[in-house]
Amino acid sequence: MIKNPKVLILTAHYGNGHVQVAKTLEQTFRQKGIKDVIVCDLFGESHPVITDITKYLYLKSYTIGKELYRLFYYGVEKIYDKKIASWYANFGRKRLKLLLQAEKPDIVINTFPIIAVPELKKQTGISIPVYNVLTDFCVHKIWIHREVDRYFVATDHVKKVMVDIGVPAEQIVETGIPIRSSFELKINPDIIYNKYQLCKNKKILLIVAGAHGVLGSVKELCQSFMSVPDLQVVVVCGKNEALKQDLVGVQETNPDALKVFGYVENIDELFRVTSCMITKPGGITLSEAAALQVPVILYKPVPGQENENAMYFERKGAAVVIRDDSEVFAKTEALLQDDMKLLQMKEAMKSIYRPEPADHIVDTILAENHVEPNHIPIKSPALAQSFT
């Protein structure tokens, strides 16, 4: 039994999803009385220059590098066992050894496919439990290593794929992907309509444009949607200040039809009142949409995990996938006018959702390490406190 375990969560800043999952798990551990939790961007700390370059190339995959990313993602999948594993296993190894020596963690969790820890276990025989928390609705071989003790995955489909690859079924737990706790609260939506000046009697289209310009032609799209009767368009620009300023001018022509926001801290509030959402198919965003049963229109998924995510949600009937700019307006307008289709998509989202994934993961890890959680009450956000 470990009395006061130290938990090390390894992650990486490729998109916000991996880090967000790490922070959600950290918060969940702390809520259960586990105070000694460290979150580390291993690659960023080990090789900052290489990491910055690869992050830049990752973002460019949304615009000019799709074929390059396709070759990388699917090519590495094919040759991983033979050529890539030995190189990748040593990436971040020096920093990792120093970190393990200094912090002496009892538990290691990966929210990014970092195999340096299980490879170190294999080579040195160190005894430390390693857990991989997969952050998409698919699996790449780079996540898999014999020295990983347990995998937490989004769906039974992912589990089946992993079993087919050769991972023992008993090592895989279907939990869903950890999401922010705010997405799992029960909140009366009336105050949300007032807060964002939205109308309960109109359809609401949420466009999550993102900070990196990954959603094209947003201005033109907004102008087109503003002509649709009984529709309000809400655009979240994130930290893309240039896009926000560009759209503010459009908003001024009809402030009731278009609402423009920068970074929205409590974006779950907008999820709760939207009729459907245009977004990119990241694993975390899709998990949050599933939690609140938001039908999604997935915009031009990049080859790789985004495309795999999109195809899964499309097969399940929870998403409409857009692969060409010319389709966005027509397909979105048609969906907004089809209440039966929207209801079916909501039901499909409900079937995908797994409640309280972070709690499930943390409870499983603590139980396997014979740790008794000591729950610490956490105050609910003010909006949730307004309704009981």
From Swiss-Prot:
**Reaction(s) catalysed by this chain's protein:** a 1,2-diacyl-3-O-(beta-D-glucopyranosyl)-sn-glycerol + UDP-alpha-D-glucose = a 1,2-diacyl-3-O-(beta-D-Glc-(1->6)-beta-D-Glc)-sn-glycerol + UDP + H(+); a 1,2-diacyl-3-O-(beta-D-Glc-(1->6)-beta-D-Glc)-sn-glycerol + UDP-alpha-D-glucose = a 1,2-diacyl-3-O-(beta-D-Glc-(1->6)-beta-D-Glc-(1->6)-beta-D-Glc)-sn-glycerol + UDP + H(+); a 1,2-diacyl-sn-glycerol + UDP-alpha-D-glucose = a 1,2-diacyl-3-O-(beta-D-glucopyranosyl)-sn-glycerol + UDP + H(+)
Q: Which InterPro entries match?
A: Diacylglyc_glucosyltr_N, Glyco_trans_28_C, Glycosyltransf_28_UgtP, Pro_diacylglycrl_glcsylTrfase
Gene Ontology biological-process entries:
enterobacterial common antigen biosynthetic process; glycolipid biosynthetic process; lipoteichoic acid biosynthetic process
Q: Give a Gene Ontology cellular component term annotated to this protein.
A: plasma membrane
Identify the metabolic or biological route this protein is part of: Glycolipid metabolism; diglucosyl-diacylglycerol biosynthesis
State which Enzyme Commission number(s) the record gives. 2.4.1.315
Q: Which PANTHER family match?
A: MONOGALACTOSYLDIACYLGLYCEROL SYNTHASE, MONOGALACTOSYLDIACYLGLYCEROL SYNTHASE 1, CHLOROPLASTIC
- Give a yes or no for keyword Cell membrane in this entry: yes
Q: Which Pfam families match?
A: Glyco_tran_28_C (PF04101), MGDG_synth (PF06925)
Location (main, coarse): membrane
**Compartment(s) of residence:** Cell membrane
Designated name of the protein:
Processive diacylglycerol beta-glucosyltransferase
Q: What does this protein do?
A: Processive glucosyltransferase involved in the biosynthesis of both the bilayer- and non-bilayer-forming membrane glucolipids. Is able to successively transfer up to three glucosyl residues to diacylglycerol (DAG), thereby catalyzing the formation of beta-monoglucosyl-DAG (3-O-(beta-D-glucopyranosyl)-1,2-diacyl-sn-glycerol), beta-diglucosyl-DAG (3-O-(beta-D-glucopyranosyl-beta-(1->6)-D-glucopyranosyl)-1,2-diacyl-sn-glycerol) and beta-triglucosyl-DAG (3-O-(beta-D-glucopyranosyl-beta-(1->6)-D-glucopyranosyl-beta-(1->6)-D-glucopyranosyl)-1,2-diacyl-sn-glycerol).
Q: Name one GO molecular function term.
A: 1,2-diacylglycerol 3-glucosyltransferase activity
Gene designation: ugtP
Question: Which top EC class is given?
Answer: transferase
Q: What organism does the record attribute this protein to? A: Bacillus anthracis
Keywords for the protein's UniProt record, in alphabetical order: Carbohydrate metabolism, Cell membrane, Glycosyltransferase, Lipid biosynthesis, Lipid metabolism, Membrane, Transferase
Q: List the disulfide bonds.
A: none
The family annotation for this protein states: Belongs to the glycosyltransferase 28 family. UgtP subfamily.
- Matches recorded under CDD domains: GT28_Beta-DGS-like (cd17507)
